[in-house]
Amino acid sequence: MNDFILKGEFEGRNMKKIILSAIVACAAFGAGMNYTDVVKDVYADANSAKSIGRLLPTNAVEILQTSGDRAQIKVKGYQNPAVSNVVYFADGARIISVAFAKTAPFDIKVIKEGKNGKWNEVETTVFVQKDGFSTDVNAMFAKADKMYKESCGVCHALPQTTHFNANQWPSLLKSMIGRTAIEKKDEWLVIEYLQKHSSDVNLGK
Protein backbone atom coordinates (compact mmCIF):
# COMPACT_ATOMS: atom_id res chain seq x y z
CA MET A 1 0.00 0.00 0.00
CA ASN A 2 2.83 2.40 0.93
CA ASP A 3 4.56 1.64 -2.37
CA PHE A 4 1.33 2.42 -4.21
CA ILE A 5 0.95 5.74 -2.36
CA LEU A 6 4.56 6.70 -3.04
CA LYS A 7 4.15 5.82 -6.72
CA GLY A 8 1.04 7.99 -6.91
CA GLU A 9 2.83 10.91 -5.26
CA PHE A 10 5.77 10.56 -7.66
CA GLU A 11 3.51 10.45 -10.73
CA GLY A 12 1.62 13.48 -9.43
CA ARG A 13 4.83 15.47 -9.00
CA ASN A 14 6.04 14.39 -12.44
CA MET A 15 2.74 15.49 -14.02
CA LYS A 16 3.04 18.91 -12.32
CA LYS A 17 6.63 19.23 -13.57
CA ILE A 18 5.59 18.54 -17.18
CA ILE A 19 2.64 20.95 -16.98
CA LEU A 20 4.80 23.75 -15.54
CA SER A 21 7.50 23.32 -18.18
CA ALA A 22 4.84 23.25 -20.90
CA ILE A 23 3.52 26.57 -19.58
CA VAL A 24 7.03 28.00 -19.87
CA ALA A 25 7.34 26.56 -23.37
CA CYS A 26 4.01 28.14 -24.28
CA ALA A 27 5.51 31.54 -23.54
CA ALA A 28 7.72 30.98 -26.58
CA PHE A 29 4.59 30.72 -28.72
CA GLY A 30 4.47 34.47 -29.15
CA ALA A 31 5.58 37.46 -31.15
CA GLY A 32 8.82 37.08 -33.06
CA MET A 33 8.75 33.29 -33.14
CA ASN A 34 8.59 31.22 -36.33
CA TYR A 35 7.49 27.66 -37.00
CA THR A 36 7.63 25.06 -39.74
CA ASP A 37 5.01 22.42 -40.54
CA VAL A 38 7.54 19.98 -42.00
CA VAL A 39 10.71 18.30 -40.78
CA LYS A 40 13.76 20.42 -41.67
CA ASP A 41 17.38 19.34 -41.87
CA VAL A 42 19.71 21.38 -39.66
CA TYR A 43 23.31 22.30 -40.49
CA ALA A 44 26.34 23.42 -38.50
CA ASP A 45 26.90 26.50 -40.70
CA ALA A 46 25.54 28.44 -43.67
CA ASN A 47 27.55 26.52 -46.28
CA SER A 48 27.68 22.92 -45.11
CA ALA A 49 25.97 20.37 -47.36
CA LYS A 50 25.86 17.69 -44.66
CA SER A 51 22.91 17.68 -42.27
CA ILE A 52 23.71 17.20 -38.57
CA GLY A 53 20.13 16.67 -37.39
CA ARG A 54 16.48 17.59 -37.78
CA LEU A 55 14.12 20.32 -36.60
CA LEU A 56 10.62 18.94 -36.05
CA PRO A 57 7.36 20.76 -36.86
CA THR A 58 5.53 23.33 -34.67
CA ASN A 59 8.55 24.13 -32.50
CA ALA A 60 9.28 27.81 -31.90
CA VAL A 61 12.50 29.16 -33.42
CA GLU A 62 14.06 32.60 -33.34
CA ILE A 63 15.53 33.59 -36.69
CA LEU A 64 18.82 35.34 -35.93
CA GLN A 65 19.99 36.11 -39.47
CA THR A 66 19.85 34.88 -43.04
CA SER A 67 22.66 34.10 -45.47
CA GLY A 68 21.81 33.07 -49.03
CA ASP A 69 19.16 30.37 -48.81
CA ARG A 70 19.97 29.56 -45.18
CA ALA A 71 18.72 31.00 -41.90
CA GLN A 72 20.52 30.85 -38.58
CA ILE A 73 18.01 29.96 -35.87
CA LYS A 74 17.98 29.58 -32.10
CA VAL A 75 15.89 26.90 -30.43
CA LYS A 76 15.28 26.73 -26.68
CA GLY A 77 14.05 23.72 -24.75
CA TYR A 78 15.08 21.00 -22.33
CA GLN A 79 17.76 18.30 -22.29
CA ASN A 80 17.33 14.89 -20.71
CA PRO A 81 20.71 14.08 -19.09
CA ALA A 82 20.43 10.56 -20.50
CA VAL A 83 19.93 11.82 -24.10
CA SER A 84 22.53 14.51 -24.78
CA ASN A 85 21.83 14.93 -28.52
CA VAL A 86 18.16 16.00 -28.27
CA VAL A 87 16.44 19.26 -27.34
CA TYR A 88 12.93 18.60 -26.04
CA PHE A 89 9.90 20.91 -25.99
CA ALA A 90 9.02 20.36 -22.31
CA ASP A 91 10.69 19.08 -19.16
CA GLY A 92 9.93 15.40 -18.65
CA ALA A 93 8.02 14.91 -21.90
CA ARG A 94 9.66 13.31 -24.93
CA ILE A 95 8.42 15.91 -27.42
CA ILE A 96 11.39 16.44 -29.73
CA SER A 97 12.24 19.95 -30.91
CA VAL A 98 15.66 19.27 -32.42
CA ALA A 99 17.42 15.90 -32.68
CA PHE A 100 21.09 15.75 -33.64
CA ALA A 101 22.94 12.76 -35.04
CA LYS A 102 24.96 11.28 -32.16
CA THR A 103 28.20 11.59 -34.13
CA ALA A 104 27.49 15.16 -35.33
CA PRO A 105 29.42 18.22 -34.08
CA PHE A 106 26.39 19.73 -32.33
CA ASP A 107 26.47 22.43 -29.67
CA ILE A 108 23.77 22.53 -26.98
CA LYS A 109 24.31 25.20 -24.32
CA VAL A 110 22.93 24.80 -20.81
CA ILE A 111 21.01 27.91 -19.71
CA LYS A 112 19.90 26.56 -16.35
CA GLU A 113 20.96 23.32 -14.73
CA GLY A 114 18.13 21.02 -13.74
CA LYS A 115 17.87 20.01 -10.09
CA ASN A 116 15.81 17.46 -8.15
CA GLY A 117 15.10 15.39 -11.25
CA LYS A 118 14.35 18.32 -13.56
CA TRP A 119 15.96 18.44 -17.00
CA ASN A 120 18.42 21.15 -18.00
CA GLU A 121 17.05 24.23 -19.75
CA VAL A 122 19.11 24.58 -22.94
CA GLU A 123 19.42 26.34 -26.26
CA THR A 124 21.08 25.53 -29.56
CA THR A 125 21.92 27.60 -32.64
CA VAL A 126 21.86 25.93 -36.06
CA PHE A 127 21.27 26.69 -39.74
CA VAL A 128 18.29 25.58 -41.86
CA GLN A 129 16.80 26.33 -45.28
CA LYS A 130 15.11 29.69 -44.74
CA ASP A 131 11.91 28.91 -46.67
CA GLY A 132 8.75 27.41 -45.21
CA PHE A 133 8.52 29.31 -41.92
CA SER A 134 5.37 30.96 -40.57
CA THR A 135 4.39 32.80 -37.39
CA ASP A 136 0.96 31.11 -37.35
CA VAL A 137 1.45 27.90 -35.39
CA ASN A 138 -2.29 27.61 -34.74
CA ALA A 139 -2.91 27.15 -38.47
CA MET A 140 -0.42 24.26 -38.39
CA PHE A 141 -2.20 22.70 -35.42
CA ALA A 142 -5.54 23.10 -37.24
CA LYS A 143 -4.09 21.36 -40.31
CA ALA A 144 -2.80 18.48 -38.17
CA ASP A 145 -6.10 18.23 -36.28
CA LYS A 146 -8.01 17.95 -39.58
CA MET A 147 -5.69 15.20 -40.87
CA TYR A 148 -5.95 13.30 -37.59
CA LYS A 149 -9.75 13.45 -37.48
CA GLU A 150 -10.25 12.62 -41.16
CA SER A 151 -7.69 9.80 -41.29
CA CYS A 152 -7.73 8.13 -37.89
CA GLY A 153 -11.47 7.97 -37.21
CA VAL A 154 -12.30 5.76 -40.20
CA CYS A 155 -11.65 2.33 -38.66
CA HIS A 156 -12.46 3.00 -35.00
CA ALA A 157 -13.69 5.59 -32.53
CA LEU A 158 -11.32 8.55 -32.55
CA PRO A 159 -9.47 8.97 -29.22
CA GLN A 160 -9.38 12.49 -27.82
CA THR A 161 -5.88 13.98 -27.90
CA THR A 162 -5.98 14.09 -24.09
CA HIS A 163 -6.73 10.37 -23.84
CA PHE A 164 -2.98 9.62 -23.90
CA ASN A 165 0.08 11.40 -22.55
CA ALA A 166 2.81 12.98 -24.67
CA ASN A 167 5.18 10.03 -24.39
CA GLN A 168 2.53 7.55 -25.55
CA TRP A 169 1.36 9.30 -28.73
CA PRO A 170 4.32 8.68 -31.13
CA SER A 171 4.19 4.87 -30.95
CA LEU A 172 0.37 4.85 -30.97
CA LEU A 173 0.14 6.94 -34.14
CA LYS A 174 2.95 5.03 -35.85
CA SER A 175 1.11 1.75 -35.16
CA MET A 176 -1.91 2.88 -37.19
CA ILE A 177 -0.52 5.43 -39.65
CA GLY A 178 0.01 2.79 -42.36
CA ARG A 179 -3.77 2.37 -42.54
CA THR A 180 -4.43 6.11 -42.93
CA ALA A 181 -4.15 8.69 -45.70
CA ILE A 182 -1.56 10.70 -43.74
CA GLU A 183 1.48 11.24 -45.96
CA LYS A 184 5.01 10.55 -44.74
CA LYS A 185 5.90 14.25 -44.86
CA ASP A 186 3.01 15.04 -42.48
CA GLU A 187 3.66 12.26 -39.97
CA TRP A 188 5.68 14.36 -37.54
CA LEU A 189 3.31 17.32 -37.86
CA VAL A 190 0.47 15.14 -36.58
CA ILE A 191 2.63 13.51 -33.88
CA GLU A 192 3.78 16.88 -32.54
CA TYR A 193 0.19 18.16 -32.57
CA LEU A 194 -1.03 15.14 -30.59
CA GLN A 195 1.83 15.38 -28.09
CA LYS A 196 1.31 19.10 -27.52
CA HIS A 197 -2.42 18.54 -26.93
CA SER A 198 -1.99 15.40 -24.78
CA SER A 199 -3.17 14.77 -21.23
CA ASP A 200 0.00 16.08 -19.58
CA VAL A 201 0.85 19.01 -21.88
CA ASN A 202 -2.32 20.19 -23.67
CA LEU A 203 -1.61 23.61 -25.15
CA GLY A 204 -5.26 23.78 -26.20
CA LYS A 205 -6.74 24.04 -22.72
Question: What residue spans do the PLM features occupy?
Answer:
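C-terminal capping alpha-helices of c-type cytochrome domains
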Residues: 180-205
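Sec-dependent N-terminal signal peptides
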Residues: 18-27
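Gly/Gly-Pro-rich "capping" loops immediately C-terminal to redox-active cysteine motifs
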Residues: 157-180
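Short, Lys/Arg-enriched N-terminal segments with co-localized hydrophobic residues
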Residues: 3-14
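SH3/SH3-like beta-barrel superfamily modules
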Residues: 54-127
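Electrostatic cytochrome c docking/interface patches
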Residues: 121-145
